[in-house]
UniProtKB/Swiss-Prot annotation:
It comes from Nocardia farcinica (strain IFM 10152). It holds the Pfam family Elong-fact-P_C. Pathway: Protein biosynthesis; polypeptide chain elongation. The gene is efp. This is Elongation factor P. InterPro entries: Elong-fact-P_C, NA-bd_OB-fold, Rib_uL2_dom2, Transl_elong_fac_P/YeiP, Transl_elong_KOW-like, Transl_elong_P/YeiP_cen, Transl_elong_P/YeiP_CS, Transl_elongation_fac_P. HAMAP family: EF_P. Keywords: Cytoplasm, Elongation factor, Protein biosynthesis.
Length: 187
């Protein structure tokens, strides 16, 4: 059990039998009335985000989430196979569980897998990943109608928007949370 004063981003709560992760929270002390905590909760299974308000001091049940260091091995149909770094056990995780970050998974990439009661909840990739551009068109210097970016296909098959000066074969640093371009990796 956790008190509302123990809330922090990333804490997983058990509300109405559902696992909810705190994405954002704010303690509010109005001029009149009791204090409360306003939160944004993400359903760990479905990914749906909801707003929920708790009265200050309320006890809420927390879920024990075990984060394990794992290595991504390979893609098998609609599943992704990972190996536990300590026990060397292999587990398959569905594409639905991994979500949109699956497009940035590269073989032998170190990731963290959150587990609850032996079942994988979600996969956390490093915030920035280094991937090579396999295809992009030549960007014309005078072409500014697109805001100075062009599409590029990465070695994982993901397509991202990159600046015009990026060429095929360049190694890029990409934000795995939203797919945005962070910079070029110096070779």
């Amino acid at each position: 059990m956790a008190d509302t004063s123990d809330f922090k981003n990333g804490l997983v709560l058990k509300i109405d039998g559902q696992l909810q992760q705190i994405v954002e929270f704010q303690h509010v002390k109005p001029g009149k009335g009791p204090a409360f905590v306003r939160t944004k909760l993400k359903n760990v299974v479905s990914g749906k985000i909801v707003d929920k308000t708790f009265n200050a001091g309320v006890k809420v049940e927390t879920a024990t989430v075990d984060r394990r260091d794992m290595t991504y091995l390979y893609h098998d149909g609609s599943d992704y196979v990972f190996m536990d770094g300590e026990t060397f056990d292999q587990i398959s995780i569905s594409e639905a569980t991994i979500g949109s970050s699956a497009r940035f998974l590269l073989e032998n990439m170190a990731v963290q897998v959150a587990m609850h009661e032996g079942a994988p909840l979600y996969v956390e990739l490093p915030v920035s990943v280094e991937l090579e551009v396999t295809h992009t068109d030549i960007g014309l210097q005078g072409d500014r109608s697109t805001g100075g970016t062009k599409p590029a296909t990465l070695e994982t098959g993901a397509e991202v928007q990159v600046p015009l000066f990026i060429n095929t074969g360049d190694k890029l640093r990409i934000d795995s949370r939203d797919g945005s371009y962070l910079g070029r990796v110096n070779a």
